[in-house]
């Protein structure tokens, strides 16, 4: 993928707060399921914003670094999803989303970002991302000191 879309920590907080606003009233939710690993940070933010204490994970492995591969379910709470909010950072090809829908047909499924191939599989999302764009998540980056321009030239 040649294009990149960078999400900062501030962006992530803002996007998740927007998602949380849409999930009111919070009392309708029994809990939150974060899709590991990308949905873990958004799940924590939604849990805070909505005051939800019951947070669990569904663990599906479908990426090996930046390449998609076969899907493996590593952990899955056993229920149909009724009363649960499922959160992931992104819906891309839709493969993971299809599996989530199959496993939890009664849950509400939201993502922070959505690409065209998968966006119809989620109930809500905040940011549209072109299909050919790689998303740089804040947890994949480090903050580092950058030398001022005037010092580099000496």
Curated annotation (Swiss-Prot):
It catalyses: GMP + diphosphate = guanine + 5-phospho-alpha-D-ribose 1-diphosphate; XMP + diphosphate = xanthine + 5-phospho-alpha-D-ribose 1-diphosphate; IMP + diphosphate = hypoxanthine + 5-phospho-alpha-D-ribose 1-diphosphate. It is a peripheral membrane protein. Pathway: Purine metabolism; GMP biosynthesis via salvage pathway; GMP from guanine: step 1/1; Purine metabolism; XMP biosynthesis via salvage pathway; XMP from xanthine: step 1/1. Xanthine binds at residues 92, 135. CDD domains: PRTases_typeI. 5-phospho-alpha-D-ribose 1-diphosphate binds at residues 37-38, 69, 88-96. One of its GO terms (cellular component) is cytosol. Keywords: Cell inner membrane, Cell membrane, Glycosyltransferase, Magnesium, Membrane, Metal-binding, Purine salvage, Transferase. GMP binds at residues 69, 92-96, 134-135. Mg(2+) binds at residue 89. Its EC number is 2.4.2.-, 2.4.2.22. GO terms for biological process: GMP salvage; IMP salvage; purine ribonucleoside salvage; XMP salvage. Pfam families: Pribosyltran. Guanine binds at residues 92, 135. Its cofactor is Mg(2+). It is found in: Cell inner membrane. One of its GO terms (molecular function) is hypoxanthine phosphoribosyltransferase activity. It is an enzyme of class 2 (transferase). Belongs to the purine/pyrimidine phosphoribosyltransferase family. XGPT subfamily. NCBIfam families: PRK09177.1. Purine salvage pathway enzyme that catalyzes the transfer of the ribosyl-5-phosphate group from 5-phospho-alpha-D-ribose 1-diphosphate (PRPP) to the N9 position of the 6-oxopurines guanine and xanthine to form the corresponding ribonucleotides GMP (guanosine 5'-monophosphate) and XMP (xanthosine 5'-monophosphate), with the release of PPi. To a lesser extent, also acts on hypoxanthine. This is Xanthine-guanine phosphoribosyltransferase.
